[in-house]
Amino acid sequence: MTGAAGPAAKAHEIAVSVCRRAYARIEPALRAAVDRLPRHLALMSGYHLGWWGPGGDPAERARTGKAVRPALTFLAAEALGAPPRHAVPGAVAVELVHNFALVHDDIMDGDTTRRGRPTVWQQYGTGAALLTGDGLYVLAADTLAAPHTPRSTWAVTLLTRAMLATLHGQASDHAFTRAPWSGPGAVTLADYRRAAAAKTGALLAGATALGALLAGGGPRQVARLALFGRRIGVAFQCADDVIGLWGRQSATGKPVGSDLSEGRRTLPVIAALASGTPAGDRLAALLHRHRGRLGEAELPAALELTEAAGGRAAAEAEARRQQEAALAAVAGLPMPEHTRTELHAMAHYLTAREQ
């Protein structure tokens, strides 16, 4: 392995190690939090988190989440010289709210599988899944409000503001599906960036801000690390949009082009439609002809036109730009060199994701 592949592979290796370390740090407290829920909600929460099967059989262990957000919380705290234990409440809280959002997203999107098995609503019913998501959200706030959590009032405020911003982003994303594909009222690149900064960037910003806050950081340090999280969140969303169109089914669990077939306004398509190119015009005509709901027969042509109009390249360039802005946000912030290396690795890992 030579050239760019070498550093990229090393960054991936470091980031995966950071995430695994973060999950090992939070798992005991995460399990203790879930145990505080009513028995049936705890069962469904543990099922969603990959701890056991539908009936509570621990032998049926599924894949757990990557723990990206807790990893960022720990790194932010370590950047300011705090021991990891100071950041545990924040790391647990962001993992809980992330999973709350996933449970509810699966309902809204009608997704029937996650991490290789039925989603919570598919397994237990919509009402039960809604309660499960609600329970995870309440546990997150309760974890930060606990008496032993330092600066707990500020911590809860940070979390709830991050979630409010996330809700704004989700609402925008939902509204986008009712907008025309092109012409007056179509989703613009500026609309997309605002929604991505809220929908995905806000919680990653909350994760890094919580780590800095619980480490005793001042306003400038918290703001710098929050900006890192927000920018890398947008980069992550841009990369995710590329994967949603061209990612291999073996890696994503979804058919190639699934985002486009479901009518989602993702960055490659928005950029292609705004390109003013012949390919972009042909893509717009195709989408209008099929009212934005493309079947298997139309998808290959739509993907080819999106790429020919520069949509894929634009999304990848935006991901790189946001990644560079994230790294610039913490460039002047004093921190241990190994922590800086791990932050850089996480930035590359979240931007150059497997397709």
Model-based region annotation:
Residues 41-45, 112, 243-252, 280-287, ...:
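A glycine-biased, small/acidic residue-tolerant capping/turn segment at secondary-structure junctions
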